């Protein structure tokens, strides 16, 4: 089955049947028939299969940790972008007046300094990695609105991916329990057969 890039968003793919793949997260396949599953090549013993399933489970846990970190980072960025947009809107109103704008800016943790800012049509934005660029207020506002939209879409996508990942946890845990129970039944059957003999 071929996968093609979809317009759903960054990192998302759609398969031929319209199902969505999530950021390269492999889908855990539910084991319906444990007997036939255990007869497949590579599934010689229950311990081997349980080890593989546990490795898969640990990979899902690692992916969850990474996605949760991205989610926290985005949840921190979105309010900052909104606050900066509010400041730009305020500056947009004030740029026509001749009065200076009084403000406080952060020097260090819990240390602010007062400043008087004359009306201006230019602002400087931190872009990250110690890079700051000067923009017209309108350009800065457009850039920040685009960044806010992208961050919101990415957050929604991360939420969906985390939900998908939780489903994979559940499926993997159920598979592990089914294989373990199958092995217990098999050993009990073997023990009862030996006791009869």
Swiss-Prot record:
The places in or outside the cell where this protein is found are:
Cytoplasm; Nucleus
Q: Name one GO biological process term.
A: negative regulation of amyloid fibril formation
Tissue specificity, per the record, is: Ubiquitous.
Q: Its domain of life?
A: Eukaryota
Keywords, A to Z, come to: Acetylation, Chaperone, Cytoplasm, Nucleus
Looking up Gene3D superfamilies in the UniProt record yields: 1.10.287.370
List cellular component terms (GO). Answer: cytoplasm; cytosol; intracellular membrane-bounded organelle; nucleus; prefoldin complex
Bilayer-crossing regions:
none
Q: What GO MF annotations does this protein's record show?
A: amyloid-beta binding; tubulin binding; unfolded protein binding
Has the keyword Acetylation been applied to this entry? yes
Q: Which residues carry this modification: N6-acetyllysine?
A: 59
Q: Which Pfam families match?
A: Prefoldin
SUPFAM superfamilies, A to Z: Prefoldin
> Does this UniProt record's set of keywords contain Transmembrane?
no
Q: Which residues carry this modification: N-acetylalanine?
A: 2
- Briefly, what is this protein's role? Binds specifically to cytosolic chaperonin (c-CPN) and transfers target proteins to it. Binds to nascent polypeptide chain and promotes folding in an environment in which there are many competing pathways for nonnative proteins.
Protein family per UniProt:
Belongs to the prefoldin subunit alpha family.
Q: How does it assemble?
A: Heterohexamer of two PFD-alpha type and four PFD-beta type subunits. Binds to the C-terminal part of VHL.
Name of the protein described by the UniProt record:
Prefoldin subunit 3
Taxonomic source organism: Homo sapiens
Q: What is the lineage of its organism?
A: Eukaryota, Metazoa, Chordata, Craniata, Vertebrata
């Amino acid at each position: 089955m071929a996968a093609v890039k979809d317009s759903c968003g960054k990192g998302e793919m759609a398969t031929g049947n319209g199902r969505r793949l999530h950021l390269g997260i492999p889908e855990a396949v539910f084991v319906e028939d444990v007997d036939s599953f255990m007869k497949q090549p590579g599934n010689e013993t229950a311990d081997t299969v349980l080890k593989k399933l546990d490795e898969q489970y640990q990979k899902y846990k690692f992916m969850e940790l990474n996605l949760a970190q991205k989610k926290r980072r985005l949840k921190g960025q979105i309010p900052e972008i909104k606050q900066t947009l509010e400041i730009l809107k305020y500056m947009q109103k004030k740029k026509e007046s001749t009065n200076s704008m009084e403000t406080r800016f952060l020097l260090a943790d819990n240390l602010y300094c007062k400043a008087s800012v004359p009306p201006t049509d230019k602002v400087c934005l931190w872009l990250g990695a110690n890079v700051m660029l000067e923009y017209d207020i309108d350009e800065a506002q457009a850039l920040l609105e685009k960044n806010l939209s992208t961050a919101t879409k990415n957050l929604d996508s991360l939420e969906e991916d985390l939900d998908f990942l939780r489903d994979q946890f559940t499926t993997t845990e159920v598979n592990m329990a089914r294989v373990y129970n199958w092995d217990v039944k098999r050993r009990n059957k073997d023990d009862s057969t030996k006791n009869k003999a």
